[in-house]
Amino acid sequence: MCNRIISLFLLLFTGQVIALDLELTQGINSALPIAINSFGSDAAAQEIGNVIENDLTISGQFKIISGPQGANSQSSVSTLRQLGADSVVTGRVNQVGNRIEVSFTLADAVANGNILLTKTFQINANQVRALAHHISDEVYQKLTGERGIFSTRIAYISVQRNGGRSRYSLEVADADGHNPQSLLVSSEPIMSPSWSPNGKSISYVSFEKKKAEIFTVSVETGQRRLITSFPGINGAPAWSPDGRHLAVVLSKSGTPKIYDVDLSSGSMKQLTFGNSIDTEPRYSPDGRSLLFTSGRGGSPQVYRLSLADGQISRVTFEGNYNARASYTPDMKHIVMLHREDRQFNIGVQNTGGGPISNLTFSGLDESPSVSPNSRLVLYATRYQDRGVLGIVSIDGRIRMRLPAREGDVQEPAWSPYLS
């Protein structure tokens, strides 16, 4: 994988639906203890409870406390408090005609079971998982004061190999990896998925015509739009915060450079100049600057381009390879691919500068993408000789692995908030 990353930089970047299963590899001792009481015995009720438990585990902020009878049982708040729970979620699922009625209550086990939150919903059978994610968001926000990310989605590329043939698919799934859907399938590579700010479209690079082209695709309808198809490199699309522009990399004039494409008019403006390779642009959340990777200093490093005056400043100085950088949505950190001692890991640096800290340590990590609440980083890695996705907290204290059941998973992108 590392050799491929180097080759992709030098070149600019040069089936079956896969579901993902959560595996927690490292947690924290300060997680909030919470119990999820059974919502009932039928399939929908059990699924809701399981999804909520899984979501809160993914956040890394919660420790799940099991009742004395284990899963799929209900225990009193006082009993669960004795087992260590600070909060308790209790729910009920009923059939109302052809609809499903779901009620839930969040209680403060420390304060004698005081009710913190209670709500009732009516849904269709195909909305069970979506509602469970919504309940997780409500619980998370009530207990932490921050917006939950469980109703967001992730995009990634899955690759199925059979002999000498490969099948590439652009997938979209829930944030927990479930409910995957194929937006595109091709026998040629698909690369660099990037979400629009409203979460309705994804930009990507396609090689379906034996050359690189940049497209956008509607997540809802699958309708595609060709953005660029110049000779040479068309790569690394990234949306502006207002969704009106794409920053792209083109080699139509020779050396790969970064351009801005106005999506309404189709007009283009060149943003970087000179003889060095410039690639992997990412807008800052405030839209005032771009981070990008360039070899202008002799090795791949991260630079910042001011969109107001075109001034470029170097961001990274530690190590001889830093790339794929992006701001966290709160703009407190810059997350990047960092090479040290021939090991490729996910690194983080304060926006104001300073040392780069490794968040991962496998040496085979790439493609970091930050959650919309700035707390988690989704990335691609290798596990048991397969491409899988990992999640790490921005402080490095929580690590999870989402192993794919089949094939390889790569180039993940985390959506923005979708509502």
UniProtKB/Swiss-Prot annotation:
<feature type="signal peptide">
    <location>
        <begin position="1"/>
        <end position="19"/>
    </location>
</feature>
<dbReference type="InterPro" id="IPR007195">
    <property type="entry name" value="TolB_N"/>
</dbReference>
<keyword id="KW-0131">Cell cycle</keyword>
<protein>
    <recommendedName>
        <fullName>Tol-Pal system protein TolB</fullName>
    </recommendedName>
</protein>
<dbReference type="InterPro" id="IPR011659">
    <property type="entry name" value="PD40"/>
</dbReference>
<keyword id="KW-0574">Periplasm</keyword>
<dbReference type="InterPro" id="IPR011042">
    <property type="entry name" value="6-blade_b-propeller_TolB-like"/>
</dbReference>
<dbReference type="GO" id="GO:0017038">
    <property type="term" value="P:protein import"/>
</dbReference>
<dbReference type="GO" id="GO:0042597">
    <property type="term" value="C:periplasmic space"/>
</dbReference>
<comment type="function">
    <text>Part of the Tol-Pal system, which plays a role in outer membrane invagination during cell division and is important for maintaining outer membrane integrity.</text>
</comment>
<dbReference type="GO" id="GO:0051301">
    <property type="term" value="P:cell division"/>
</dbReference>
<keyword id="KW-0132">Cell division</keyword>
<dbReference type="Pfam" id="PF04052">
    <property type="entry name" value="TolB_N"/>
</dbReference>
<comment type="similarity">
    <text>Belongs to the TolB family.</text>
</comment>
<comment type="subunit">
    <text>The Tol-Pal system is composed of five core proteins: the inner membrane proteins TolA, TolQ and TolR, the periplasmic protein TolB and the outer membrane protein Pal. They form a network linking the inner and outer membranes and the peptidoglycan layer.</text>
</comment>
<keyword id="KW-0732">Signal</keyword>
<dbReference type="InterPro" id="IPR014167">
    <property type="entry name" value="Tol-Pal_TolB"/>
</dbReference>
<dbReference type="Pfam" id="PF07676">
    <property type="entry name" value="PD40"/>
</dbReference>
